[in-house]
């Protein structure tokens, strides 16, 4: 006996699969598979991939369908991609640990290995692979069971109210009547290559525009007879006393009106 499977790789496909059983507006608010922000403003931060109220709504909808009547649908995540971005300088202390958690597990235990790395090592790209699906009808501690991303800041302390780092979580769900269970694939991590900000003083035109926007030289002598910077040597070399090259703005020559 075959059973009908309601799958959803994206929110649009889920709406199509359940058309007639639920209004579009009911599932437009589920935020399935969207970019989920995660602020590291506390030492330990827990971000459910499916908020409890949303999960209860989806489970209630899927319980109306015969294949998912007893489970409320089985949620499977093929992968969870996380982008880590620090908000501190490169010499800031501390480490960060990130892992995926199943709320059925006690003490925020991880599903598979955790990833640990220095806070000051620049942005990173991570991927986690939950190897099994969970019933949306399940409850854990009177709350709907869910997968979550957990982060912990180690070996450092910062002033309260700020975020030393952020995570951006990307995932796409599959909700169906069939269960998934695979061998554990360890998480992966790659550093994101960074470059320097463009030199703001690299061109003469940009230096002139910055100076003109903040300093007036309308009372200066002409460019042919500028004021000495620090002795004749510095003036001739075009350098300040510190050895830094300087720029003397051009003075506008006075206009002479011709006699008529």
Swiss-Prot record:
<dbReference type="InterPro" id="IPR000603">
    <property type="entry name" value="MPV"/>
</dbReference>
<dbReference type="GO" id="GO:0003723">
    <property type="term" value="F:RNA binding"/>
</dbReference>
<dbReference type="Pfam" id="PF00803">
    <property type="entry name" value="3A"/>
</dbReference>
<feature type="region of interest" description="Disordered">
    <location>
        <begin position="230"/>
        <end position="260"/>
    </location>
</feature>
<dbReference type="GO" id="GO:0046740">
    <property type="term" value="P:transport of virus in host, cell to cell"/>
</dbReference>
<comment type="function">
    <text>Transports viral genome to neighboring plant cells directly through plasmosdesmata, without any budding. The movement protein allows efficient cell to cell propagation, by bypassing the host cell wall barrier. Might act by forming tubules structures that increase the size exclusion limit (SEL) of plasmodesmata, thereby allowing viral ribonucleoproteins to spread directly to neighboring cells. Binds to ssRNA.</text>
</comment>
<keyword id="KW-0813">Transport</keyword>
<keyword id="KW-0694">RNA-binding</keyword>
<keyword id="KW-0916">Viral movement protein</keyword>
<protein>
    <recommendedName>
        <fullName>Movement protein</fullName>
    </recommendedName>
</protein>
